[in-house]
From Swiss-Prot:
Positions bearing N-acetylalanine: 2
Pfam families, sorted: SPC25
Protein name per Swiss-Prot or TrEMBL: Signal peptidase complex subunit 2
Cytoplasmic side: 2-86, 133-226
Species name: Macaca fascicularis
Subunit structure: Component of the signal peptidase complex paralog A (SPC-A) composed of a catalytic subunit SEC11A and three accessory subunits SPCS1, SPCS2 and SPCS3. Component of the signal peptidase complex paralog C (SPC-C) composed of a catalytic subunit SEC11C and three accessory subunits SPCS1, SPCS2 and SPCS3. Within the complex, interacts with SEC11A or SEC11C and SPCS1. The complex induces a local thinning of the ER membrane which is used to measure the length of the signal peptide (SP) h-region of protein substrates.
Primary subcellular site in the record, as a coarse category: endoplasmic reticulum
InterPro entries referenced in this protein's UniProt entry, alphabetically: Spc2/SPCS2 (IPR009582)
Gene expressing this chain: SPCS2
Gly residues composition bias: residue spans: 9-26
Modified residues (N6-acetyllysine): 169, 191
Record-stated family: Belongs to the SPCS2 family.
GO BP, one annotated term: signal peptide processing
Length: 226
């Protein structure tokens, strides 16, 4: 009984010391990890096949997008995506009309309508190619920063990226467009994907997030100076 009491007292003392140490660690670590905890992707590590270039690029793009939207609280604008969806919807409309018309009026009676729909479909595909090449480019995020006073138009932030096939160099570009002056500034980095993924293919946000924040902060500082 006495030995058990003594052992319990020691355990209690150790628990108290551990609690004090935990409080100290919390005080020093919360400043660094507090922001990261807010925008983990689904609170799970992002793990991909390192040899799948598309998966690598998509995971890096999604994580960069997550930082701007959740850390900096910007509002995503879906205008670019809506434009592409509109073009695709019109293209599908022509295809459906051709299908229904051919069913109701079998060939060759449906020939003029089929020809018109086929030509229209390929014209829309050409428009889509031009749209993605010159309008969308490689942009995967357009986000707005609301003016706190509500007096000036929104500032616009754009993220675009590239990763060539069979290459390990990933380029991320951040573009800032001032809502008030319409001036545009850019910052980018090119890094090996090996810097952001461990040996198992898990994205290391502690290595990736600072690179994105540096890009953002460099443009944000210029904005404040001007």
């Amino acid at each position: 009984m006495a030995a058990a009491a003594t052992q319990g007292g020691r355990s209690g003392g150790l628990g108290g010391n551990s609690g004090a140490g935990g409080g100290s660690n919390c005080g020093t670590g919360s400043g660094r990890s507090g922001l990261l905890d807010k925008w983990k992707i689904d609170d799970k590590p992002v793990k991909i096949d390192k040899w799948d270039g598309s998966a690598v690029k998509n995971s890096l793009d999604d994580s960069a997008k997550k930082v701007l939207l959740e850390k900096y609280k910007y509002v995503e604008n879906f205008g670019l995506i809506d434009g592409r969806l509109t073009i695709c919807t019109i293209s599908c409309f022509f295809a459906i009309v051709a299908l229904i018309w051919d069913y109701m009026h079998p060939f060759p009676e449906s020939k003029p309508v089929l020809a018109l729909c086929v030509i229209s479909y390929f014209v829309m595909m050409g428009i889509l190619t031009i749209y993605t090449s010159y309008k969308e480019k490689s942009i995967f995020l357009v986000a707005h920063r609301k003016d706190p006073t509500g007096m000036d138009p929104d500032d616009i932030w754009q993220l675009s990226s590239s990763l060539k096939r069979f290459d390990d160099k990933y380029t991320l570009k951040l573009t800032f467009i001032s809502g008030r002056t319409k001036q545009q500034r850019e910052a980018e980095f090119t890094k090996s994907i090996a810097k952001f993924f461990d040996h198992s293919g898990t994205l290391v946000m502690d290595a990736y997030e600072p690179e994105i924040s540096r890009l953002h902060d460099s443009l944000a500082v210029e904005r404040k100076i001007k």
